[in-house]
From Swiss-Prot:
GO terms for biological process: cell division; cell wall organization; peptidoglycan biosynthetic process; regulation of cell shape. It is an enzyme of class 6 (ligase). Coiled coil: none annotated. GO terms for molecular function: ATP binding; UDP-N-acetylmuramate-L-alanine ligase activity. It comes from the Bacteria. It is found in: Cytoplasm. Belongs to the MurCDEF family. Pfam families: Mur_ligase (PF01225), Mur_ligase_C (PF02875), Mur_ligase_M (PF08245). The gene is murC. This is UDP-N-acetylmuramate--L-alanine ligase. HAMAP family: MurC. Cell wall formation. PANTHER family: UDP-N-ACETYLMURAMATE--L-ALANINE LIGASE, UDP-N-ACETYLMURAMATE--L-ALANINE LIGASE-RELATED.
């Protein structure tokens, strides 16, 4: 496959608006390829490509290829993602025209093979770890190429064509296609059953990740994860709990709502101290993974420890959106019980410690959660309830189906009942529509609240609904703050 894309080849992305597809399109465009793409609606990621793409279509219809032909593009390479169904009219037309069709993972695998590469996999923390890794490398002058599932603050984009020797890629495990990646260094952050629409059980996930690991020249794993520790052999490991058994480790000295201070160890010896402007033990683990990868690539330690002090989270990872009626609104991508628990724990640390990277220290936590997929909600119903009960108050949005058909009886009201079984006194409110959601937040929030919107769907529109629809007060927007 390494020689399959010639410089003059035009590449057309069906579903260009997705975070992973747009990153690939951006990099290919910056490498000089002619690109085009389509999606059902114009997304911010597509808007960023408007000046770089030959054509962008706000519909996925067969006539898009006729338009390309009118522009002199006869045989484009067509790229699709798992999200594109076999019934998609544009895909059907590409098949009728007998065009070459690649899955998104084929294109990413090709990019990974073109230069020394680091692929970041795992159930949780992939985006943050790959963003931190990219940022550290950029800060010390390495300028990596990056294909990330979130916006990297130092580049302001999810895709970047660097001039350095390394490529950093986020390796999504959701459909198992990461087994195609042959990276110079693979990282696995943790393993926990998710994406039950693809994986039958945990053993199925473990075998897929083992195949990914075997395909990498070197493998770096999280020694604190019990599944990785038991089932995987690796070239190196990291920990935020143990020094003696890890090649790279950080032991927390101070955990506050606005920062983390930890002693940093390599091969059992303390070699420095980390001052991290990101709260939460899970963020410390992500940063140590990135540090370990940099060190395995020969980056000097002193420059890295200095770079750590300037880190910021990727977009939609505890992303401060602004203030509304003396309430601070934060957006987070958490959509699995473990992610929800880690995010709520970090938010409560800000409330309880009186220290926060936000403009003002919040006094109470109002969580707004949008379950993602009916199958995931059904599979992890009790785990979601156990995680969400730690909020001071809770508003639930309708389930975001992400293309799934509804499952009878599986809805946000069922989740609310499960939460009330754990704590009958928990204030929990259920919105029947997204339009109703902002009204419930207005009704049940209070000044000095941290309004934390969590989910992988469109719950991130809550800020716009609060600030633009003028329901009850003025709103002000501030730059995203790392957390």
């Amino acid at each position: 496959m390494a020689d399959s894309i010639q410089p003059e080849k035009h590449i057309h992305f069906i579903g260009m608006g997705g975070i992973g597809m747009s990153a690939l399109a951006l990099i290919l465009a910056e490498r000089g390829h002619s690109v085009s793409g389509s999606d059902r609606k114009l997304t911010p990621a597509m808007q960023a490509l408007e000046t770089k793409a030959l054509a962008i279509f706000e519909s996925q219809v067969s006539k898009n290829f006729a338009h390309l032909q009118s522009r002199g593009i006869e045989e484009p390479l067509v790229v699709v993602s798992t999200a594109i169904p076999s019934t998609n009219p544009e895909l059907i037309e590409a098949q009728r025209l007998d065009l070459t069709i690649w899955h998104r993972s084929d294109l990413l695998a090709w990019l990974i093979e073109q230069q020394p590469s680091i692929a970041v996999a795992g159930s949780h923390g992939k985006t943050t770890t790959s963003t931190v890794l990219t940022t550290l490398l950029a800060t010390v002058g390495e300028d990596p190429t990056a294909v990330i599932g979130g916006v990297v603050p130092c580049y302001g984009s999810n895709g970047h064509k660097g001039n350095g020797r390394l490529l950093v890629a986020e390796a999504d495990e959701s459909d198992g296609s990461l087994v195609k990646f042959k990276a110079s260094l693979g990282i696995i952050t943790n393993l926990e059953l998710d994406h039950t629409d693809h994986y039958r059980n945990l053993d199925d996930l473990i075998e897929t990740m083992k195949t990914f690991g075997r395909g990498c020249k070197r493998l770096l794993i999280n020694h604190d994860d019990p599944i990785l520790k038991e089932h995987f052999q690796a070239d190196a490991c990291w920990s935020v709990h143990h020094v003696e058994t890890a090649d790279y480790a950080a032991l927390p000295v101070q955990l506050d709502g606005d920062r983390t201070i930890a002693d940093y160890f390599e091969q059992g010896q303390k070699v420095g101290q980390i001052t991290l402007p990101l709260p939460g033990l899970h963020n410390l683990s992500n940063v140590v993974a990135a540090l370990a990868a940099c060190r395995m690539e020969g980056v000097p330690l002193e420059a890295l420890l200095l770079a750590v002090t300037e880190l910021r989270s990727p977009g939609r990872r505890f992303d401060f959106r602004g203030e509304w009626q003396d309430r601070q609104v934060v957006d987070d991508y958490a959509h699995h019980p473990s992610e929800v628990q880690a995010t709520l724990t970090m938010a409560q640390l800000m409330v309880q410690s009186g220290r926060s990277p936000l403009p003002r220290t919040p006094q109470r936590l109002l969580a707004v959660f949008q379950p993602h997929r009916y199958s995931r909600t059904q599979e992890f119903l009790n785990a979601f309830a156990q995680a969400l009960v730690s909020a001071d108050a809770l508003v639930l949005a309708p389930i975001y189906g992400a293309g799934e058909q509804p499952i009878e009886g599986i809805n946000s009201e069922l989740l609310a009942r499960s939460i009330r079984l754990i704590d009958p006194n928990q204030p929990v409110f259920v919105a029947s529509t997204m339009e109703e959601l902002a009204g419930l937040v207005k009704q049940h929030s209070q000044p000095d609240d941290l309004i934390l919107a969590m989910g992988a769907g469109d719950v991130n529109s809550l800020w716009e609904r609060l600030s633009q629809e003028g329901i009850g007060g003025e709103a002000s927007c501030s730059p995203a703050i790392a957390a």
